[in-house]
Every structure is written in structure tokens, then in C-alpha cells.
């Protein structure tokens, strides 16, 4: 496979597969007892209206909309996701607390740089290399431009991949207004920390509308400048997008998005136990930083061919660059690691509704071609002289083909969806002046989702899904004829129920996941060697409850919510068999209340996580360098009051305090800048939004 070529390969195969999907089968009469969704694109990341209903979705799924995000007082994507059952924000990386990365773990899976979930932005993979480097050490998006967060923890492995063991997370940017005229918003948020001396300002702007010619456009901007709660933790970013939509006619629509993102964060890193006790907010690594930028274009086309069929195609291309600089323990040498990536993807999808007797089949088939090209470079710089070493370089190339098909069968109150996803992956990693490491893998991922609509309010569901994680670029170096690496495989089973009526929303899910064949580094071997030797077992219960009091009652305007998750993730291989997986909490919960009265809104909420281990050996005692040891649990309280300004429509001013009790808590970082990482102290913020 040529490393530097970027033109799509095997696209005739994609076209052939797409044409083969066009059905010629005549539809039969529909049983009137079966109530169905219409086939129409609704903007959901799931692509077609057939699967858009969270209420009827046959798997654990949570959607957080913009109103709830704003009421939570969240300043980042990680903050906003703490209310989602089964999701843990670990912040155990060297960039924790900055805007450059995202650290999300689902159901006890590792959260460092979110490597186990398929993370999407408007349906497009967010990772700089979805197959070769799925880690979000560089996460090019920001909270203020997001309309909703959709987290599918189970039941989505057929449609989306490749890293779907930890479910699917989609961030949807703000939609283009469909009404005539201009609509917009301008906002600013000022944040100050009670300790550490830091403050920051976030800005956001939105302007858009749709003309009489059915052409819609929107401009989205979000930015930040300032410093976090650690000394020398300067943090700034710019997030810009320009979106277009054009309705060709009643059946056809074109969509496009141009995007740009840049970020630069100074990263103080971890502290030893003695350093933390002296001053937890100090910075002993003032030269460390991470930075990155990304430009991209997304194109989409949808054709609702008839009341029973729909065709959609999504194409995207993006270029990303990220770099880091970390000083060594002796404080004499900087290691600089610049990396460049290019990703091209195209995905056609076709849906056909067929009526066979009393059953109705919504058959969806799709194909995705994804091409990655990039390089990893590394060199050192002497701090005293500035002299740089020779640069080590690896060039990476991946061509991946995925074909999927599922059939959503509706018969009576049953919704049964069998499906399968096939992946074919070609990967090369070439060392400059050295050897080339290659991997050729294919995998079939069968799944079945079942939902029963017991009443109009209650859905009972269950599913069995097969998920996988491909071999990553850095792991190819250790592959030999006697040590071939294969994709990681996980098998997940869910049972759950979801209730939704005008006042009450509730859900509970029981899950069990067996994650075998994990690629792990073999201890005690130099140079680093990876093998398929890892296995973990994950099980738990996720629950959520939300209640809105009646508008004509004494408690009108009051909303209460709570969620609780119990997870047990155990290692099943090696010397630590039977011990907990590092960096997850067995118990997490959140509770809160929202009360609206006469233009005022009051919010109070709390999040809790139990203690966790920072190493596979489950070491309780803390080492002097604070790299290992038990991480204590914590409960935090937040409060916010917002006032809707009279005469200015939906505009408002809000004041809030996060970590009301000023709890001093920390996590651990096990990277090259390891140690205790103090979390945010009591935090004050004021924000204003003007909407028109």
C-alpha cells in the first residue's frame, strides 16, 4: 500500500455495493395494528428517522440537550457528560483540566483520551485517525457550539465503528434555523477560581437562517482565553464552523460544513505527594505544552425517494496537526512530538421499507470507505543549549472498508433488529530508513436488538452486540510472524426498560460485557512489545429518573432528576486476575433540582464518584511520587441562578458556583508527567446570553 497516496482506493467496490442495495421487491399490504415511524431524515446522528426515537431505541441511550447543558453550569464537554449514566470523566492524563483533550470512560473501560468509544461530531469521527490513533489526546470541538450530546452505550455497534466497545458518542453542532430571517446569539462567560489565581473568559456567537430560496446557512464560533486553576496553565482555543443546507426539492437536500479549530494549552502535569501538600496548585513543569489545529469539510446528500425509501451519502475530509513538549525528570531535556494526519471518508446508505404479511421490514445497508495518512515524529531539545537531536519518524497508512446491514422488523408491538457489520482493514507503519510493519485484518460483528412496546409509555429492550477495537499504529512495531496482532473483541448483553410520559422519564439497564483479546504491552520487555493477552469482565446497573411537576399544581416549575450507576470491571488475565481495572469508580451518581418561576431559574446539583485504583495491581498505599495509590472518592455540589431579561426574548444572565464546599480532591496521572492532579477548587462564574 503506498504510504503517501491519498486518492480513494477501491471506490468502484463502494459504488457496486451501493447499487446492489437498490431493491426491486414489491411491497405488500401493511398490518394496521403495527404503528411505525415515517422514513425521513431528522438530523439525528443515527441517519434516518427510523431509529431516531430514544423512547423506542432497543439499547441504553441518553440524550442531553442544550437547555440541560446550560443549566448544569458545565464549561467543557467533560463537565457536561457527568450526568450521563455509565459515563465517567477520568481526567487521568497529562493534559487533564485543559481544552486540548477528552477523557471519557464508559462502563469501566479506560478513560484516558477516550480510546474505547466511537466519538463523532455531526456523524463524522472526531479522532485524528479513527483506526490508527483513536485516542482523543486532541479533541477538536468545544461545548458552546454543541446543540446536543447523544450517548448510545449499547445497540449501536452495527452502524458505527471502529472503536465501538464503549458505545457511540455523538456531539451535534447547532442546527441551521429553518425560519426566515436572521437568528442569532452572542454570549460571554467569565470564570474565576477560588484558589490558584486563575481566571478565563469564554466567548460564543451564532448567526443563521434560511432564505426564501430554501438556502440555509449558519456561522458558529466559540473561543476561550485565560488560565485554569493551576499556576502556568494558560489555555486558549478557537472553534469556528460554517454550515450550509439547501433543499433542492421536497425530497432532496444538500448539506455542507466547513470547520476550523486550534488550541494551545500549558500542562502543569502531576505533583509528588510532598509537592501537593506544599501547594496543590503549583506548576513544576512550566515548559510543558500541547497544541493542535484541524481544518475539515463535511458534505451530505439525502434523497427521500418515496414514502418507503431513502438514500443518504456522507463524505468528509480533514487535516489535523498536534504537537507536545514534555521535560524529562532531570529538567535538562525536552521531548517534542509533532504529528500530522489526513483522513478521507465516504459513506453511502440506503433504507427500504418492505411489507411482508403482518411484519414491516426497514432494511438499511451501508458502506464506508475511510483512508488515513499521517506521520509521527519525535526529537529532543537540550534545555541549556537548545540543540536538537535527529528526528525519528514513522509514516502511517490505513485503508478501511466497512459494510453493514440491519433489518428493523416491526410486528405488533415487537421491534426486532438483527444486523451485521463487516470490517476489512489494511494498515502499514513505516520507519524512516527502517522496516515496514503491516497488518491485514477483517472482522464480522453480528448484533441483535429487541424492543417490546409494552404500553405507549413503557418500552422493554434487550440486545446482544459484538464490538471491536482495531490494531493501532504504535502497536504495529512489535508485530512479527510469530506474534501477529488481531483486533480486540467485546461481546455485550443488555436488558432494560424505559418509561416516558408527560411528567416522568425513567430508565434502568443491566449490562454484562466480556472484553477478550485485548492488546496489552508485555511487562518487563524492551523494546515495548504488544500481544493479544488482555481480558476484562464488566457488569453493572445503570438507572436514571426525571420528574416534572404539573404546571397547574402547587409545585409548578419544579423538575427533579437523579441517576445512579454501579459498575464492576475486573481483570481476567495475567498476574492481576480478579482485581479491579484501573481508573474507574464502582459507584457514581448525580442528583439535582431545577425550579423556574417568573423569569427566574434556580438549579442545584450534585455529582459523586467512589474511590478508584490507579494501577492494575490495585495498590492502596500511595508512593512518594504519587504515581500509584488509591484515589479517594468525592461528592461535589453546584448551584446556579439565571434571570431572563424582560423585553429581550430568550436572553439571560446567570451566576453560578461549582464545588460549593471547596472540596480539595485529585486524581492521578500516570503519563510521563505523573503524579497527583488537583481538581478544580470552588469556581465562580457569570455568563450572559443575548438571543434574537
Regions found by a protein language model. Give the residues of each.
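Surface-exposed extracellular loop regions of Gram-negative outer-membrane beta-barrel proteins
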Residues: 264-266, 270-279, 371-384, 426-431, ...
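Face-selective signature of the C-terminal outer-membrane beta-barrel domain
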Residues: 247-259, 291-432, 437, 545
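Gram-negative outer-membrane beta-barrel transporters
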Residues: 350, 357, 413-416, 512-514, ...
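Short acidic/polar hinge/loop motifs at secondary-structure boundaries
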Residues: 124-153, 242
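Transmembrane beta-barrel wall of Gram-negative outer-membrane proteins
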Residues: 196-225, 229-268, 289-304, 357, ...
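Membrane-embedded beta-barrel scaffold of Gram-negative outer-membrane proteins
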Residues: 186, 204-205, 300-304, 310-326, ...
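C-terminal beta-signal and adjacent terminal beta-strands/loops
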Residues: 558, 610-617, 642-692
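Extracytoplasmic beta-strand/coil segments of soluble accessory domains associated
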Residues: 78, 82-125
